[in-house]
Swiss-Prot record:
Organism this protein belongs to: Danio rerio (Zebrafish)
Official protein name in the record: Transmembrane protein 178B
InterPro entries xref list: PMP22/EMP/MP20/Claudin, T178A/B
Keyword line: Membrane, Signal, Transmembrane, Transmembrane helix
Disulfide bond positions: none
Highest taxon above the source species: Eukaryota
Locations listed in the record: Membrane
Entry-linked Gene3D superfamilies: 1.20.140.150
Pfam families listed in its UniProt record: Claudin_2 (PF13903)
Amino acid sequence: MAAGKLLLYAGLSLSLCALGMLAVAICSDHWYETDARRYRERCRSFSSRRKDPGFIYIPNNSLPLRASRSRLDRWEEKLLLARNRRQLFAMSAADECSKRYNSTNMGLWSKCHRLGFDQEIEDLIRNGSIARCSYIKYHYSSATIPKDLSYNITKTIRQDEWHSLHLRRMTAGFMGMAVAIILFGWIIGMLGCCWDRGLMQYVAGLLFLMGGTFCIISLCTCVAGINFELSRYPRYIYGLPDDISHGYGWSMFCAWGGLGLSLIAGFFCTLAPSVQPIPRSTCPKSRQENGTVC
């Protein structure tokens, strides 16, 4: 009896912690973060080079005066690959620096400039020229599609926009359903604990497992959406330069923690009724003898 109660109380406590972690993850804006400080430094050094007529800038690593022939061959191959890549994707150093990349953090509802990463952005925000955060759209809008592109590229971008929009909707929708199901399961579990109903406790555990499943779907679609955005065509519009570091923030790990706690809570609550002994009635059962009921 004590083991069953302990499992039930532990499951309800873990489910409440899972609700808190998922709520924090939903309300925060640190699911995905980018750091463009190295990119800014490279572009500043690129813009500060000499631009005199007839002056050709050649970096030191392009002058292998003491290199062997094999190293020269490997270096020429690397230069050829880099040149082909820039011709294919139009991502030369000048092209990369002509586009402005900022250090941002993104959540389910908004995308914000990171605090203290760029003094120019901080001054613009302080003056009211730009807002720190912009809302993420969950409806289709053609305003974000560049106008000076060919028809085939524009069609590809439009299809990718729809696909990215569906992934964002699935991420937010399944995360909201996961929180609602876990909350409903916690209410059912509390009622089953107060009324000592094993069936309600078992149903609460199943709801916790279902909420964890929905949370898995939401997180997987979130990761798929981020990877899809990074691999969109054309790369010179949607890709990131190599010196911009990016990765998942603490909100994503908070959501994964809530997922794990909800699954553990579901396991505990479904196991609790089977551990508790079946209550025996003190009243003897009536039996039928010789056509009469005793």
